[in-house]
């Protein structure tokens, strides 16, 4: 059973009022939990920075939040997923990365997702986005330091440095055998096995980490081409199909790109993009999340539309 019953309204209240000491404590606890996660944790099997998930029960998958705390609350309230996690171990909450920057409630988002992880260690997975990347790959604008200054006053630096240290312990990907590969950005033709993804954060693999965190699917590219983002690449349909084939997955689920509808489908239904925040600078009409029965098998992201919730 979880360490404690988590009251959502209390969590929201706490996140909005937490002082730097409470924030730092949550980051420290989460970091020590993540650092020591290895092997079997609930329905998760942890292999370095890869999470293998059993095809049991359901998953709630959330895309980029970028400091939009309101959208996170809407998703958790509407889905009733926290209560579900309390009732059954077979409910897994997966975040696809990009928690901070842009929106002005980055600290609140970090606090809330870390408290969720601490309450349900075997049921919450926090992926790494390009806004949680190593220093030389970090997404722009990186306005987290300014937000922390505003939020925490003179203690902001410690809170910020701890949060930056936490980034290294977030996961590169989630894999559900014969079903899904979930990453923040994209895939690369360099991927030969799950092991490559699991150790992509190690120095010699940084080009692969860059692709996982930064790359985008493109309909007009055959293989790969340079990305207008200045990091990562654009990858074509052929790359998607080859990588999914090598790994034994059917659909790539990722975040990283805004979409007016909150989601989009590419590469003949082999790529689903989720975007879960609203507001500037994207002004998308909808945010979306995915609430998915994991035991069912789908070949194509078109079949997942019935499980996508727009708000």
What are these regions (language model features)?
Residues 1-311:
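Feature recognizes metal-dependent phosphohydrolase scaffolds
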């Amino acid at each position: 059973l979880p360490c404690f019953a988590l009251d959502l309204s209390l969590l929201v209240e706490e996140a909005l009022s937490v002082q730097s000491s409470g924030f730092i404590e949550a980051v420290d606890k989460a970091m020590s939990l993540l650092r020591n996660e290895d092997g079997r944790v609930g329905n998760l099997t942890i292999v370095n920075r890869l999470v293998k998930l059993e095809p049991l029960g359901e998953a709630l998958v959330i895309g980029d939040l970028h400091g939009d705390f309101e959208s996170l609350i809407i998703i958790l309230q509407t889905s009733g997923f926290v209560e579900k996690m309390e009732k059954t171990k077979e409910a897994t909450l997966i975040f696809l990365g990009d928690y901070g920057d842009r929106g002005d409630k980055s600290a609140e988002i970090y606090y809330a997702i870390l408290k969720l992880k601490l309450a349900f260690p075997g049921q919450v997975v926090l992926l790494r986005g390009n806004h949680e990347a190593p220093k030389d790959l970090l997404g722009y604008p990186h306005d987290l330091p300014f937000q922390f200054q505003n939020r925490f006053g003179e203690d902001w630096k410690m809170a910020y440095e701890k949060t930056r240290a936490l980034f290294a312990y977030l996961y590169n990907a989630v894999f559900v055998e014969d079903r899904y590969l979930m990453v923040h950005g994209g895939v690369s033709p360099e991927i030969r096995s799950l092991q490559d993804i699991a150790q992509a954060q190690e120095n010699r693999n940084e080009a692969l980490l860059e692709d996982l965190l930064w790359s985008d699917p493109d309909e007009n590219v055959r293989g790969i081409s340079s990305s207008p983002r200045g990091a990562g690449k654009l990858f074509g349909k052929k790359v998607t199909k080859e990588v999914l084939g090598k790994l034994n997955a059917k659909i790539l689920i990722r975040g990283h790109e805004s979409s007016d509808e909150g989601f989009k489908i590419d590469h003949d239904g082999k790529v689903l993009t989720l975007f879960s925040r609203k507001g500037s600078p994207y002004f998308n009409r909808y945010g979306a999340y995915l609430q998915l029965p994991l035991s069912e098998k789908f070949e194509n992201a078109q079949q997942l539309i019935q499980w996508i919730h727009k708000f």
